[in-house]
Regions:
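Active-site rim beta-loop-alpha module in soluble metabolic enzymes
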Residues: 95-167
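Metabolite-binding pocket within alpha/beta catalytic cores that recognizes anionic/polar moieties
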Residues: 1-114
Length: 167
């Protein structure tokens, strides 16, 4: 849905759950603005899109009880999505990745987590003062990746406890 809010043109788009769906939306919105579909080439002038994801999340740390509004300063991805794109190490916060893996004693069988920073100017524009700012985690699934166990055992049953203690 596209309309105006306080004189600014905005589009609201549902992406579904997960990084894989967001990957589709981001790439296709970028293509609509920056690719000439007749010639199948990039347009000479690029349009930068400002995207804000609004959604739900669970909370593992005590300062984020249920119902708390959270604004991500950084996001750690367990899904591996960014690893499929070039320049990964230029985009990611490698120091936070390394420290996270060290503190939680990361199990390399799970994959390689990545950490990206939010745009601080955008964060300051949209995040209210009563929002908790911090690191959020994006998982590639709902059950095992988020520490939920039904019948299939978890590779690291203590991962959520270790994440809770991450500083």
């Amino acid at each position: 849905i596209t309309g105006t809010y306080k004189g600014k043109r905005i589009t609201v788009q549902s992406t579904g759950i997960g990084c894989d769906n967001i990957d589709i939306v981001v790439n296709e919105l970028d293509a609509l603005k920056n690719i000439d579909f007749k010639t199948r080439t990039e347009k000479p002038e690029h349009t930068t899109l400002t995207l804000v994801r609004i959604g739900t999340c669970g909370g593992l740390q005590l300062n984020c009880p249920a119902g708390t509004f959270v604004a991500s300063q950084k996001s750690i991805g367990f899904d591996g999505l960014i690893n499929f794109y070039a320049r990964r190490n230029e985009i990611c916060d490698l120091d936070t990745e390394k420290e996270f893996k060290r503190q939680v004693k990361w199990n390399d069988q799970i994959g390689n987590p990545y950490c990206v920073d939010n745009n601080p100017e955008l964060l300051d524009r949209i995040a209210a003062d009563d929002m908790v700012r911090g690191i959020t985690i994006a998982c590639g699934g709902f059950y095992g990746p988020q520490g939920r166990e039904l019948r299939a055992p978890l590779a690291d049953p203590e991962l959520n406890t270790k994440i809770e203690a991450f500083e």
